[in-house]
Every structure is written in structure tokens, then in C-alpha cells.
């Protein structure tokens, strides 16, 4: 890995480099995605099946688009029993963590008869997109579905692309069953996002779409936002490690590679105050890469977006981390909790040498759907709140309104909205 002494100039170049990975820079695909969305919006199932045959090489029809109970049972036979148990344990952890996020409706009555409050209810239908093929990750099913279940969403549907044989990845189906998905449809890509956003004869229109996907899926979610709520427009995976001289270089190297193997656009960055550690980590990375199954992807990823940044102090490391606002941030320092207090921007923070990033990917319980490409500055991980909607409640008695009605009329008149003022004034007209 390249080792760079961090300066104002090198930091500027690094940040510009990382931002080029954003889906907002994939403009050349937007017209193709827009065409797919429009065709599905107008053509419904017919367009959906046509695109499924074109992109997934699978002939699909209304009779076979929905996964049956028999197909789920068959999937259980194909998935290792030990893995099924591991998924159940993971699901229990995810559910327990997200249950702590639940919020109830509240009301605040006053002695004068005023009642203010917030009515909190789950959305009616959630749609989860799950990639297929080599990118089929059962963990994504659990992480996207379980917060919706905890929130109380009554109907959760899932779309995932079929193989040429019309089958869906068995691990994906088992995870969906464990998580409690109500309906699973064999359709993928931008066409699946369009189907959930606008509805077709076979697939219902949903209130919110979540889940990862390729460039086309990301752009489709972006284009459909406003017609439907979405979780985020996720970019490539990223990890940033802050480490000092106390860190184990093998641990640091292994953790950097855990994200670099995702794809060629993934970023893996170490920020350290120790030149010795920097050199050791670089050596360990080379040793690990030689024996990893996704070596080619890792090498391209590190060549594109792999950095070891040398800084003068941990305060400088924290400042840089806050500017990058990484999806995953590991802190491997003498006092990681003290270091954590200096971090404002990160999707998830992993503290200490036994809190490796994959712990969060699979098992700990916090959601692994995290903001990327610097959006941790203003976005949060997927959570129960994403599947809840809130409605303000306002109730005033006549005496309560009478005390303030002139204030409201004054406000309305100063904004030039006389009908607003009249709506209040008319309630206190003297009867003849």
C-alpha cells in the first residue's frame, strides 16, 4: 500500500479522489435507467418480464414471479444447517439491538385544554432489494428486513434477481424466511426498483425501498425518490482505521482487506502516527493478499483507493477522519474510547482490537447499512425510525385559543395571508 505523509495538499487530493466513487458521478447511466423506469411505469408486468429476460436471461411470467413456500423449503435443504443456526443467532442480535430504538406516540395535555403530541406509526408496506448472483448476501436481508419488522411494518416484500434457471439464491431465501419477509419476487435491477416504486400487476407499490445494489439499482433509487422513500444512494464500501504504535499490524492489515475485497472501488485507509506501524502494515497486507480468494479485486481496490496516511498527532487523525466521514471507522489506539469522543462523522465506530469490522457486518446487532461517500456527515445507519412515520397532533379548547388568537392573527396579517387570519378571527365573532 502507498504510504503518504498527510499535508493540506495531499488531503485535498485524497478527498477529491474518494468522492469520485459517488453514484452522483455515474451520469452516463442515468438515461438508460430513466428509460427502464418509464417503461415499467407504463408497461407494468410486461416490461418487467421483458427486462428480466434481457438482463437475467430468464423467462418470467405472472405465475412464477413470486417465490412459493415449496421453493423456500427447497432452499433450506440446500443451505448448511450450521449456517442456518448462525443466521438465526445473528437475527436475534439484530432484532434485540433495534428493539431499543422503538419510540411510542406521545401526548402532552395542558391544564387549559391544549393537547399537543406526536402520533408514531409504521409505514404500511416496505420493499427490500437484495442483489443476486455473486453479490447475494443473506446478511443484507437480515439487516434490511428486521428493522422494518421491529417497527411493525405489516407487509414487507422483497425483490431479488433470478438465475437463468428461474431460481433464487437459497441463502437469500432462507434469510428472508428467518427475518419474516411476507412476499418474495424474482426480479432484479432498476426494473425491480421501478416496480416497487410505482407498482405493477404482480408487485405492489411500496412506501419505502431499502437495500444495496449495483450502479443501476442506486440510480433507480435516486430517480424514484419522491415517489417513494428510500434508505440512501449507497456508494462502494469503505473502511478507515485510526491506529497508533500500540496496534497489531496484522490486525490492521486484515481489517483493511476485509473491505478492499468488496469491489475495485472500495476504499481502505489507515491513518497512523507511527511510521513503524505503517511499514509493518504494508508488509502484512502483501502477505495476506497473496493467499486471498479475491486477490485480483483487492489489488485493484488498493491501487485505486488504498492509502496509509502518516499524521503528526491523533488529533490530526481525528480531524482527517471527520473530513472523510467513512462508512466504517476502526479505532486501534491505546485508549480507543477517549479517541471516540473526538469523532463526529462515521457510519459505525469499532473500538479496540477485538472489534473487527466484520463483527458489525454479520453479528453484533447494529445495522450494517451505513452512509458512504462522506454522507456520514448528515446521514445515519438504517434503523427502526426509517420505517416509522410521524404525525403532529394539535388540539386547542376555546379558552386556550382565545388567549392567543390575536397573536396568530397578527402573524398571518404580517405575512399577507388574510384568509389565515380570518380562519382564527371567525371563531371569536360576536354573535348578533
What are these language model-derived features?
Residues 108-174:
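Conserved small-residue-rich beta-alpha loop and adjacent elements
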Residues 154-163, 268-274, 281, 352:
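Short internal beta-strands
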Residues 322-432:
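C-terminal core of ALDH-fold dehydrogenases
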Residues 180-258, 262-267:
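Conserved NAD(P)+-binding/catalytic subdomain of aldehyde/semialdehyde dehydrogenases
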Residues 262, 270-346:
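A glycine- and small/hydrophobic-rich beta-loop-beta segment
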Residues 3-9, 183-188, 308-313:
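Short acidic-hydrophobic, aromatic-tinged amphipathic segments that line or gate anion-handling sites
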Residues 1-124:
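N-terminal Rossmann-like NAD(P)+-binding subdomain of aldehyde/semialdehyde dehydrogenases
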Amino acid at each position: 500500500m502507498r504510504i503518504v505523509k498527510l499535508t493540506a495538499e495531499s488531503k485535498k487530493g485524497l478527498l477529491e479522489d474518494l468522492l469520485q466513487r459517488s453514484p452522483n458521478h455515474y451520469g452516463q447511466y442515468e438515461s438508460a435507467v430513466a428509460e427502464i423506469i418509464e417503461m415499467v411505469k407504463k408497461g407494468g408486468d410486461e416490461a418487467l418480464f421483458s427486462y428480466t429476460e434481457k438482463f437475467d436471461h430468464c423467462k418470467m411470467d405472472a405465475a412464477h414471479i413470486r417465490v412459493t413456500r415449496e421453493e423456500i423449503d427447497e432452499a433450506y435443504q440446500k443451505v448448511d444447517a450450521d449456517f442456518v443456526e448462525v443466521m438465526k443467532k445473528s437475527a436475534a442480535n439484530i432484532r434485540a439491538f433495534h428493539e431499543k430504538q422503538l419510540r411510542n406516540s406521545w401526548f402532552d395535555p395542558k391544564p387549559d385544554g391544549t393537547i399537543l403530541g406526536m402520533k408514531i406509526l409504521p409505514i404500511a408496506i416496505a420493499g427490500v432489494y437484495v442483489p443476486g448472483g455473486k453479490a447475494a448476501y443473506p446478511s443484507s436481508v437480515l439487516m434490511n428486513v428486521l428493522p422494518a419488522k421491529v417497527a411493525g411494518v405489516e407487509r414487507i416484500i422483497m425483490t431479488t434477481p433470478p438465475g437463468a434457471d428461474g431460481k433464487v439464491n437459497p441463502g437469500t431465501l432462507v434469510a428472508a424466511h428467518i427475518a419474516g419477509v411476507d412476499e418474495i419476487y424474482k426480479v432484479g435491477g432498476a426494473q425491480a426498483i421501478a416496480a416497487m416504486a410505482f407498482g405493477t400487476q404482480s408487485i405492489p407499490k411500496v412506501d419505502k425501498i431499502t437495500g444495496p445494489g449495483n450502479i443501476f439499482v442506486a440510480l433507480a433509487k435516486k430517480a424514484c425518490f419522491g415517489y417513494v422513500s428510500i434508505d440512501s444512494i449507497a456508494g462502494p464500501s469503505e473502511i478507515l482505521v485510526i491506529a497508533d504504535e500500540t496496534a497489531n499490524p496484522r490486525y490492521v492489515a486484515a481489517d483493511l482487506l476485509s473491505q478492499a475485497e468488496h469491489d475495485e472501488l472500495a476504499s481502505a485507509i489507515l491513518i497512523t502516527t507511527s511510521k513503524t506501524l505503517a511499514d509493518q502494515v504494508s508488509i502484512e497486507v502483501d502477505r495476506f493478499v497473496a493467499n486471498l480468494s479475491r486477490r485480483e479485486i483487492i489489488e485493484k481496490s488498493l491501487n485505486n483507493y488504498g492509502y496509509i496516511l502518516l499524521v503528526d498527532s491523533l488529533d490530526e487523525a481525528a480531524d482527517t477522519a471527520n473530513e472523510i466521514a467513512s462508512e466504517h471507522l476502526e479505532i486501534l489506539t491505546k485508549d480507543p474510547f477517549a479517541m471516540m469522543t473526538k469523532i463526529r462523522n462515521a457510519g459505525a465506530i469499532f473500538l479496540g482490537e477485538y472489534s473487527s469490522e466484520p463483527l458489525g457486518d454479520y453479528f453484533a446487532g447494529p445495522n450494517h447499512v451505513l452512509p458512504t461517500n462522506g454522507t456520514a456527515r448528515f446521514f445515519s445507519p438504517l434503523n427502526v425510525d426509517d420505517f416509522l412515520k410521524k404525525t403532529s397532533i394539535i388540539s386547542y379548547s376555546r379558552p386556550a385559543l382565545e388567549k392567543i388568537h390575536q397573536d396568530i392573527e397578527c402573524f398571518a396579517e404580517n405575512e399577507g395571508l388574510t384568509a389565515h387570519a380570518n380562519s382564527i378571527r371567525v371563531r371569536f365573532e360576536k354573535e348578533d
